[in-house]
């Protein structure tokens, strides 16, 4: 059935259709509803996400006050680049997207069959679906991991393990070329699965998640639009140029190139990406604006809760 183009298209279409149906029953974001002046709807949505037994009155009041203050000055695309805080946030979001794409995730997924052939891996072409399964299953578990682990830690571990995997594959490729590699053809497949698993655990979802965490509500939509467009432009460019890189430096060096960029990505995270878990939107934005406030004992709106909403 899958070999039939019509049935294959129907199978692929079933997934977005399922998402469409599911989203019909999903409440709107409390932050968005509050920004539209729909107080009662925002409260109902937040109660849906928090659970009936949780007290949300303090969080609703804090959210209402913050959004009212942030929405006083709505910005245009041009004005995004006029404030220190939004410029820093754009640098962080653009940087994360750059290193996410420069890890080579899309070329590896799209050219998996050709890559395995370069490694002399004798597998059924359909076996490359294992990589897709690793991506989907790891993404599911990462949603639970994001609730307990810090963003920076996940990004650093994710980039490091991706670099280690790709670097190991590059070494393995050159060992194979010199006829000194082990005969176990499952090594490349297993290593690629590790690469994809750690991508899905951090580098994949966190740059998108942080878009809702590092920008004020009044600029989030425009900043997200710019960043998303930049992301897909990079995805197209890296995927398009991958074959040229392979032709120029062969598969082993190309994977090594991606590994080096993953290392640089981890350095970028260490020095430039702030921790956002367990912090309020105001605290994060104050950091970008260079404002230092005295810590007070107050109710904290966890950023991840808003982004999940």
Task: Give the role of each language-model region.
Residues 1-49, 68-309:
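Alpha-helical transmembrane bundle of multi-pass membrane proteins
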Residues 56-68:
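Short, well-structured alpha-helical segments
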């Amino acid at each position: 059935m899958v070999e039939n183009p019509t049935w294959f298209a129907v199978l692929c279409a079933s997934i977005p259709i399922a998402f469409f149906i599911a989203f019909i029953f999903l409440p709107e974001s409390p932050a968005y509803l509050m920004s539209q002046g729909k107080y009662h709807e925002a409260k109902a949505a937040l109660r849906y996400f928090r659970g009936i037994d949780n007290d949300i009155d303090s969080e609703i009041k804090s959210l209402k006050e913050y959004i009212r203050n942030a929405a006083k000055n709505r910005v245009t695309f041009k004005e995004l680049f006029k404030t220190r805080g939004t410029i820093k946030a754009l640098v962080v979001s653009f940087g994360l997207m750059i290193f996410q794409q420069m890890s080579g995730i899309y070329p590896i997924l799209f050219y998996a069959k050709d890559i395995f052939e370069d490694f002399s891996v004798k597998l059924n072409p359909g076996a490359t679906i294992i990589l897709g399964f690793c991506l989907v299953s790891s993404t599911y578990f990462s949603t639970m991991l994001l609730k307990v682990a810090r963003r920076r830690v996940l990004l650093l571990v994710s980039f490091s393990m991706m670099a280690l995997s790709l670097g190991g594959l590059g070494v393995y490729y050159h060992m194979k070329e010199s006829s000194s590699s082990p005969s176990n053809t499952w090594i490349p497949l297993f290593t690629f699965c590790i690469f994809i698993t750690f991508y899905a655990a951090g580098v994949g979802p966190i740059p998108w998640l942080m878009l809702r965490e590092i920008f004020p509500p009044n600029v989030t939509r425009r900043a997200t639009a710019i960043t998303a467009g930049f992301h897909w432009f990079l995805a197209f460019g890296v995927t398009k140029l991958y074959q040229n890189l392979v032709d120029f430096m062969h598969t082993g060096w190309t994977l090594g190139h991606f590994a080096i960029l993953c290392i640089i990505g981890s350095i970028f995270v260490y020095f430039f990406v702030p921790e956002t878990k367990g912090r309020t939107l105001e605290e994060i934005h104050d950091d970008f604006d260079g404002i230092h406030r005295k810590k007070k004992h107050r109710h904290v709106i966890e950023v991840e809760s808003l982004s999940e909403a």
